[in-house]
Amino acid sequence: MMISKKYTLWALNPLLLTMMAPAVAQQTDDETFVVSANRSNRTVAEMAQTTWVIENAELEQQIQGGKELKDALAQLIPGLDVSSRSRTNYGMNVRGRPLVVLVDGVRLNSSRTDSRQLDSIDPFNIDRIEVISGATSLYGGGSTGGLINIVTKKGQPETIMEFEAGTKSGFSSSKDHDERIAGAVSGGNEHISGRLSVAYQKFGGWFDGNGDATLLDNTQTGLQYSDRLDIMGTGTLNIDESRQLQLITQYYKSQGDDDYGLNLGKGFSAIRGTSTPFVSNGLNSDRIPGTERHLISLQYSDSAFLGQELVGQVYYRDESLRFYPFPTVNANKQVTAFSSSQQDTDQYGMKLTLNSKPMDGWQITWGLDADHERFTSNQMFFDLAQASASGGLNNKKIYTTGRYPSYDITNLAAFLQSGYDINNLFTLNGGVRYQYTENKIDDFIGYAQQRQIAAGKATSADAIPGGSVDYDNFLFNAGLLMHITERQQAWLNFSQGVELPDPGKYYGRGIYGAAVNGHLPLTKSVNVSDSKLEGVKVDSYELGWRFTGNNLRTQIAAYYSISDKSVVANKDLTISVVDDKRRIYGVEGAVDYLIPDTDWSTGVNFNVLKTESKVNGTWQKYDVKTASPSKATAYIGWAPDPWSLRVQSTTSFDVSDAQGYKVDGYTTVDLLGSYQLPVGTLSFSIENLFDRDYTTVWGQRAPLYYSPGYGPASLYDYKGRGRTFGLNYSVLF
């Protein structure tokens, strides 16, 4: 394996540390890794902000050890919350606030706040992951907590073939097994190269630490009994020494396997609390939950464009998100409808970035961004009698209605970023981004009224008028970087991010009168023109320090973020931007140590934080449905050639709020290992080594959202997986 000469700050795994030890001493201190996510070709050592780079070797160690992508990232990224262990990454914040996820610079976040950005790519196709902690406006709104940029594998000039196959099981049942297989071929020459890959994974049943089947998540949808397919192609054309074209295409599909579902008991008795929900076969549904995406991106770069470095990108992506069938329940705990939503997004856009150095010590980055998004949705209703008799397994469509108003969003933005070396010790950074947003909302018949029409209880209804509304945001950042030594930096940073409101959540609401000759008249509705949305700004401050030595590498930052507004949908069908002060403060960091002259290494990473809101002039603990718990991970590794062994732990700590609600913490321990064969590598793992029985963070939050209105808390008690054994073989030739 070739060792990169680029010097980076990461949470090193023991195998990588051992491999790197001889090379590190030979590297010069300025051989640092260029982070593409910052759009300014700055290295980690030049960043006045907490920055992490997860290299391929350490990610592979987790994935080939059986970890899901969300689990691996939570283990390796200090500021990222623990995994939901579900299809969703809902509630997985960075530093307690939402994050933006990109694939090769293309945003996966949409205006709707559906959280499946990490259900978007098979890890087999990932080269590295770049993380910027704290608020940033580099890629538009939404990244008030941080940014994760997934950089995909690209073709190489020489012919390379990759193959990987693995399985894992807890041996609790004949259904308790997952399998994965993946292959890729890449090649070319110095002028043109490409890579084509196919990765497939099949998930079976999951069982908790007591050997009981874990419940399927019928709120955000789970991964049990599902399949995942990721087909990706990349191509690179080197036009000449300075110009390059790069093409990326992807088809991704992850959905249930059409057979297993959540049995809610005959007559939906589990919702009334008179029976226990369980997972069973026999699912026969006209809508299967899952995620389907297409992505295509074309990037042009020119390192000698009028004395500047130019990067231009155009892209298109679409996604279809389908959710698990869910009941509508009245005040008497009777199920009045059983339905499933589908939400579709089409987005295209462009990015233009130019980097220049007008004089020694002065760097300027500027550019333009533009994108357009179209959102549509529908709700499929099933025959209630059949669904009830089968416990929610036999779901035959009877009609489909709209779910939210359709809308178009256009964003236009310009940004300017500058860095100036005051002297050999200090670098001053600063920048501004201006973003203009226009929302166009379609006319929309109320959701309940559409149901009445579809059920034959009415013949027509007035439409809630749509309309157009726009708003803009100026976002600023400034930082001072101190170069203490060539291997040590400290920084003070201020940056702003913005939370863009979800139009589907606020518009399309109205009050209707009684039917007149079958027609439902609209008496009052949200007026789009008079209900202007606006972004909610977050101010983020941090003081940080990093050291990158031969054996010791560490990065630590104290941070504080505050927002003072939120968007509220009022009962009188108006929308208000109200005072709502929320602050989050904490410390994020990582320490990795390679014990000299041994095969041993050890390390920890952590994010200790507190979230508070201001109520009647007093700061109080924030709602546990949103507040992130503190987290810590640790590992110890031993890597005598050709072995590599790692024991690691992940701890999510207790968090409580002013109302007395609490999310309990837990600790899990994993054993990961590998053995280098004459051809290929055999990896093995034991996840949840001590078979801990626990409820995930999402499993503790979900009852606060859905119970008792949609059934007892036990219906939403999503457990973590018990002890699970994994075996994987990979080869590169």
From Swiss-Prot:
It comes from the Bacteria. Residues 158-733 form the TBDR beta-barrel domain. Residues 1-25 form the signal peptide. It is a multi-pass membrane protein. Pfam families: Plug, TonB_dep_Rec_b-barrel. InterPro entries: Plug_dom, Plug_dom_sf, TonB-dep_rcpt-like, TonB-dep_rcpt_b-brl, TonB_box_CS, TonB_rcpt_b-brl_sf, TonB_rcpt_CS, TonB_sidphr_rcpt. Gene3D superfamilies: TonB-dependent receptor, beta-barrel domain (2.40.170.20), TonB-dependent receptor, plug domain (2.170.130.10). A motif (TonB C-terminal box) lies at residues 716-733. Keywords: Cell outer membrane, Ion transport, Iron, Iron transport, Membrane, Plasmid, Receptor, Signal, TonB box, Transmembrane, Transmembrane beta strand, Transport. One of its GO terms (cellular component) is cell outer membrane. Residues 43-153 form the TBDR plug domain. One of its GO terms (biological process) is aerobactin transport. A motif (TonB box) lies at residues 31-38. Induction: Under iron starvation. It is found in: Cell outer membrane. One of its GO terms (molecular function) is siderophore uptake transmembrane transporter activity. SUPFAM superfamilies: Porins. Its main location: membrane. Receptor for aerobactin. Belongs to the TonB-dependent receptor family. This is Ferric aerobactin receptor. It comes from Klebsiella pneumoniae. The gene is iutA.
